[in-house]
Swiss-Prot record:
Matching SMART domains: S4
Record-stated family: Belongs to the pseudouridine synthase RsuA family.
SUPFAM superfamilies assigned: Alpha-L RNA-binding motif (SSF55174), Pseudouridine synthase (SSF55120)
Protein name: Uncharacterized RNA pseudouridine synthase jhp_1352
Keyword Cell wall biogenesis/degradation: no
Length: 262
C-alpha cells in the first residue's frame, strides 16, 4: 500500500488479529509505539513509520497489493453506485476514498450483514464466482415445516420462483441446491429463526425459497462470507480484513491461480 496513512486503530486492525476496539485498548494500555514513541488514539501511521506492539515490530504484508473492506450493510441501502429512485446507496455511507471499490456480489435492499468490497477486480471476480459458503441468520413467518427441511436437505427446483422476488424480476424459474447446513434456532407459529449456510448467490435466493412455502422472510442477515465473519462489526461500519483473513485470501487466490494453471 504505497503512500498510505492510517489511524493507529485501523493499522492494527489491518495488520494484526485485533479488532479496532481491541486496538484502541492496546493503545490506551501503552503497549503500542510508533517509531519508539507511545502511540495515542489520534496517532496516524504513515508509509515509512515503524509500529511496535509489545516491543515486536508489526510488518505489513509485502505481497498485499490490494485492499478488501468488510462493510456491515444496513437494511435500506442499495448495493449500487446510484439509484434512479433516489434510494440510499452504500457509497453514500462509505468514505469517499473507497468510491472506486467494487462490491463482491449483492445483498438486497431489505437485508443486512457482511458485504465485501475491493479495489482489485481480480479479487472481486474470484470471491464472487468461487461458490464460497455464505451464512445467514433468517427470521421467517410461521413454523419451519418438514417440507422446508426436506427441500433444504435435498434441494428444490421451481418453474415459478417469482414469489419473494421483485415484481419486475426477469428470473422466473430457479433451482436451489441442497443447503450446506442449517440450524433451527426457534420454531414457533408466529415466527421462526434459522441459521442457514449456502454456497450460491442467486437473486433473492432465500426469500424465494421460503416464499414458496408461504413463509415470508421477516429478517435476513448475512453473518459470514467465506472466511470473513461479521462478528461484532456495528451496522453501517467498515473495516479492513485482518492479517489472518488476508493470509486466507492470499492462499485462496494462489490456489485458484494454481488450479487455472493445471
Amino acid at each position: 500500500m504505497e503512500g498510505f496513512s492510517l489511524r493507529i486503530n485501523q493499522f492494527l486492525a489491518h495488520y494484526t488479529k485485533h479488532s479496532r476496539r481491541e486496538a484502541e485498548k492496546l493503545v490506551l494500555e501503552g503497549r503500542v509505539k510508533i517509531n519508539h514513541e507511545h502511540a495515542k488514539l489520534a496517532s496516524v501511521v504513515k508509509e515509512n513509520d515503524k509500529v511496535f506492539l509489545d516491543k515486536r515490530l508489526i510488518k505489513p504484508l509485502k505481497n498485499k497489493k490490494f485492499s478488501v473492506l468488510v462493510y456491515h450493510k444496513p437494511k435500506g441501502e442499495l448495493v449500487s453506485k446510484a439509484d434512479p429512485l433516489k434510494r440510499h446507496v452504500i457509497y453514500e455511507s462509505l468514505e469517499k476514498k473507497y468510491a472506486h471499490f467494487a462490491p463482491v456480489g449483492r445483498l438486497d435492499f431489505a437485508s443486512e450483514g457482511v458485504l465485501l468490497l475491493s479495489d482489485s477486480k481480480a479479487v472481486v471476480s474470484a470471491l464472487m464466482h468461487a461458490n464460497l459458503e455464505k451464512e445467514y441468520l433468517v427470521k421467517i413467518q410461521g413454523f419451519v415445516t418438514r417440507e422446508m427441511e426436506n427441500a433444504m436437505q435435498e434441494g428444490l427446483k421451481l418453474e415459478n420462483a417469482t414469489k419473494g422476488a421483485h415484481q419486475k424480476t426477469p428470473i422466473k424459474s430457479m433451482e436451489f441446491a441442497p443447503f450446506i447446513g442449517y440450524e433451527i434456532i426457534k420454531n414457533h407459529a408466529k415466527y421462526s429463526k434459522l441459521r442457514v449456510i449456502i454456497n450460491e448467490g442467486k437473486n433473492r435466493e432465500l426469500r424465494r425459497f421460503f416464499a414458496f412455502f408461504n413463509a415470508g422472510v421477516l429478517d435476513l442477515r448475512r453473518v459470514r462470507y467465506g472466511f470473513v465473519n461479521l462478528n461484532a462489526l456495528p451496522v453501517g461500519k467498515a473495516r479492513f480484513l485482518n492479517r489472518q483473513e488476508y493470509n486466507e485470501l492470499h492462499a485462496f487466490m494462489a490456489n485458484r491461480a494454481n488450479v487455472k494453471g493445471d
